[in-house]
């Protein structure tokens, strides 16, 4: 309704709820695809969606993200919110610390910032969004199979001469991945370790709740 009424962005609640179920092991990673297809018919073309792992409702009433995406579970889903098509990411109050409690919904509830444990993580993602046109809302999105799609979710974003590859392990177990798409083989920049690397067709492992992002 909001998108059809002229709003530029909407909350993709169905996607958030699917993310929660995947984090709990209740649904496979490819459950995200069903929501993507649903949203293509739910919203007008190119509707921007505000992806999130926590917001004021979910934090206060349902203990997001410290309860719904606890500890290392948070990271791959946060990467997803920052790199999906038609997305504008939401970082809720205190997530960069992180503040591991429910913030009062109606009353003043000051937060204390000391460690900023996720500062570099979020800064890396936000800088990537700022500099790379492949993460524009209208950049292309393509699923890529690099492993067991019940637990591995991988995709590319591309616009003009820029391309990004995202690989997410949405499970509590180490997984084996292998890149077979010839368009993804070769020199790439690892966004998180800031090193140039050569991606090849060899099998390798990705840690539980692991995430990899590459620029081409």
Name each model-derived stretch.
Residues 57-59, 96-100, 160, 170-173, ...:
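Short, solvent-exposed loop/turn segments at secondary-structure junctions
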Residues 144-181:
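Carbohydrate-binding surface patches
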Residues 1-49, 71, 98-128, 133, ...:
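Active-site-proximal helices and loops of the catalytic beta/alpha 8
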Residues 88-93, 133-139:
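Acidic/polar loop patches that form or flank catalytic/metal-binding clefts of enzymes
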Residues 199-216:
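C-terminal beta-strand-rich structural cap/linker in extracellular carbohydrate-active enzymes
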Residues 37-41, 78-82, 90, 148-160:
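Short, surface-exposed beta-strand/loop micro-motifs that present aromatic residues
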Residues 50-116:
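Aromatic/acidic polysaccharide-binding cleft in carbohydrate-active enzymes
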Residues 174-194:
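Beta-strand-rich binding/interaction modules
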């Amino acid at each position: 309704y909001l998108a059809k009424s002229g709003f530029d962005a909407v909350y993709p609640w169905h996607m958030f709820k699917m993310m929660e179920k995947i984090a709990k092991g209740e649904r496979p990673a490819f459950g995200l695809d069903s929501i993507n297809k649903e949203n293509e018919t739910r919203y007008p073309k190119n509707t921007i969606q505000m992806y999130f792992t926590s917001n004021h409702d979910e934090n206060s009433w349902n203990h997001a993200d410290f309860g719904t995406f606890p500890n290392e579970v948070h990271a791959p889903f946060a990467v997803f919110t920052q790199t999906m098509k038609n997305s504008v990411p939401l970082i809720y109050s205190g997530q960069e610390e992180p503040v591991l409690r429910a913030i009062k919904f109606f009353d003043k509830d000051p937060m204390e910032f000391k460690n900023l444990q996720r500062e570099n993580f979020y800064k890396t993602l936000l800088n990537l969004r700022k500099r790379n046109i492949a993460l524009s809302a209208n950049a292309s999105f393509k699923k890529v199979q690099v492993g067991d799609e019940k637990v591995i979710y991988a995709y590319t974003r591309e616009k003009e001469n820029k391309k990004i590859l995202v690989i997410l392990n949405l499970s509590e177990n180490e997984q084996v991945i292998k890149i077979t798409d010839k368009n993804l083989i070769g020199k790439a920049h690892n966004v998180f370790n800031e090193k140039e690397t050569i991606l090849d067709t060899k099998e390798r492992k990705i840690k539980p709740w692991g995430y990899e992002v590459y620029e081409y």
